[in-house]
Curated annotation (Swiss-Prot):
A Gene Ontology term for the protein's cellular component: cytoplasm
Species the sequence originates in: Bacillus pumilus (strain SAFR-032)
Family to which this protein belongs: Belongs to the alpha-IPM synthase/homocitrate synthase family. LeuA type 1 subfamily.
Pfam families found in the cross-reference section: HCS_D2, HMGL-like, LeuA_dimer
Protein name: 2-isopropylmalate synthase
Region annotation Regulatory domain: where it falls in the sequence: 391-517
A GO term for molecular function: acetyl-CoA C-acetyltransferase activity
Gene name of the encoded protein: leuA
């Protein structure tokens, strides 16, 4: 059976989603989860774009052992050199080099002729091949490129040493039949096409990214470029989880297989959602909360009699546990450690001790601790280790229907260890909290977005708040989890500011590194 490779671009194209700004530690956590998921290639970033991206890609390449790590580059020597330096210590360094090929891009962006683009593409693929064992070449805006010219340039970059040819629908324009026909055309008109793997990269501007990717597979594509939860620039990329499950459930039709560990899908989706701040819609295929819910009476009756009447995907297949085991205040360290292992977390003894303490504190407020609660604890604590910015200490809010809400907040400056306490009012309780926090902080902060959802079920479910703020003209997302909505709101705000300060700290370190070197 033919094998389909999954090239995941969550950390590169996915991070280009508006409002998403992952720090290096968060990217590494996501990369490790993608490795557990079983993707074949992780596109970790664009090393030449910034020193921060370079170091992030380098760390991921040095850490990941069970799949290839790729970096993006333009057809420019400087980009290729930067990518090699970032990736050379990886298991299988892979370059993803691209140049636009459509007439509209050649005329308005590159200001080059077709002949000049062919010459540049061939020269840079040859240059890259001197370093990289695997070179993937992309024809940016392939779907609006003249097919005869596309076939010509593809043939020449294959002769230059490309191992993978990517034909992206950069603007999400084509219908599935049209996109599939491009792969068919390449198969029929490029003499050396059998020497390479063909790759599909689809955007969801017209809602057809997954359908187009599957059409590419039907017409000979060997690799699919995806992002977890379908995140990405504009309307997003093809959703990894939807394609992986479709290929599995309809193996009879597609006759292909992959290395994706389907039972890791839900946790991967949760990890990406929590760190990116992009909430998964309830009706999202495969990973949405409603994906396995049945409300219609007729559907419920049939489902209870025989699941397969209305359920083609079992929750267990994608890692949605139906295990009702819960932990509580009487659960010991061993039970906690065992549950962490069951959930797939590999923790050191030091981490277990720290997380167990957080867990015990939560049991004083919440009777039953679910898997969702545990995952939230781990994800929040894992990125709270760097002692930069502010530590949230306490919050008190006074509210009455006929009174102006007043908040009192205590924060600790983690650099000076000074405890800062302020009070302020607001039109509502959340505004009062945020006005108070701003009085505690030196930064000028503008709140752009505020979202809240429950984590788990029941009246004692944890509140999960996501905010997007602008500081010094830069957007940063923050996340906070607590049993109380106002505490979660405060933590999300502090988290966003701390992420901004960590980003600034990283830039300072990078500038110091440049000065030394």
């Amino acid at each position: 059976m033919r094998k389909i490779n999954f090239f995941d671009t969550t950390l590169r194209d996915g991070e280009q989603s508006p409002g998403v700004n992952l720090n290096a530690q968060e990217k590494l956590i996501i990369a490790k989860q993608l490795e557990r998921l079983g993707v074949n290639i992780i596109e970790a970033g664009f090393p030449a774009s910034s020193r921060g991206d370079f170091l992030g890609v380098q760390e991921i390449a040095r850490t990941i052992k069970n799949c290839s790590v790729a970096g993006l580059a333009r057809c420019v020597k400087g980009d290729i050199d930067a990518a090699w330096e970032a990736l050379k210590d990886g298991v299988e360094p892979r370059l993803h080099v691209f140049i636009a090929t459509s007439d509209i891009h050649l005329k308005h962006k590159l200001k080059k002729t077709r002949e000049e683009v062919v010459e540049q593409a061939v020269a840079m693929v040859k240059y890259a091949k001197e370093r990289f064992p695997v070179v993937q070449w992309s024809a940016e805006d392939a779907c609006r490129t003249d097919l005869d010219f596309l076939a010509e340039i593809v043939e020449k970059v294959i002769d230059a040493g490309a191992s993978v040819i990517n034909l992206p629908d950069t603007v999400g324009y084509l219908a599935p039949k049209e996109y599939g026909n491009i792969f068919k055309y390449m198969k029929e008109h490029v003499p050396n096409i059998d020497r390479v793997n063909l790759s599909a990269h689809c955007h969801d501007d017209l809602g057809m990214a997954v359908a187009n990717s599957l059409a590419a597979i039907e017409n000979g594509a060997d690799q699919i470029e995806t992002a977890v939860n379908g995140i990405g620039e504009r309307a997003g990329n093809a959703a990894l989880e939807e394609i992986a499950v479709a290929l599995h459930i309809r193996k009879d039709f597609y006759q292909v297989e992959s290395t994706i560990q389907l039972n890791e899908i839900k946790r991967t989706s949760d990890v990406v959602s929590k760190y990116s701040g992009m909430i998964v819609p309830r009706n999202k295929a495969v990973v949405g909360n409603n994906a396995f819910a049945h409300e219609s009476g007729i559907h419920q009756d049939g489902f209870l009699k025989e699941k397969t009447t209305y359920e083609i995907i079992s929750p267990e297949l994608v890692g949605v546990t139906t295990d009702v085991l819960v932990l509580g205040k009487h659960s010991g360290r061993h039970a906690f450690k065992d549950r962490m292992k069951t959930l797939g977390f590999k923790l050191t003894e030091e981490e277990i001790n720290k997380f167990f303490e957080t867990f015990k504190n939560l049991t004083e407020k919440k009777k039953e601790i679910t898997d969702d609660d545990l995952i939230s604890i781990i994800l929040e604590e894992k990125v709270a280790d760097r002692k930069i910015g502010y530590e949230f200490e306490s919050l008190q809010v006074h509210y009455g229907t006929e009174q102006m809400p007043t908040a009192t907040v205590s924060l600790k400056n983690q650099e000076t260890q000074e405890v800062i306490q302020e009070a302020a009012t607001g039109a509502g309780s959340v505004e009062a909290v945020y006005n108070t926090l701003e009085r505690c902080m030196e930064e000028r902060i503008h709140l752009l977005d505020y979202r809240i959802q429950s984590n788990g079920k029941g009246r004692d479910a944890l509140a999960e708040v996501y905010v997007t703020v602008s500081i010094e003209g830069k957007e940063t997302a923050g996340r906070g989890v607590a049993q109380d909505v106002l505490e979660a709101s405060a933590k999300a705000y502090v988290n966003a500011v701390n992420r901004h300060l960590i980003f600034k700290s990283n830039l300072i370190e990078i500038e110091k590194h440049h000065a030394i070197s």
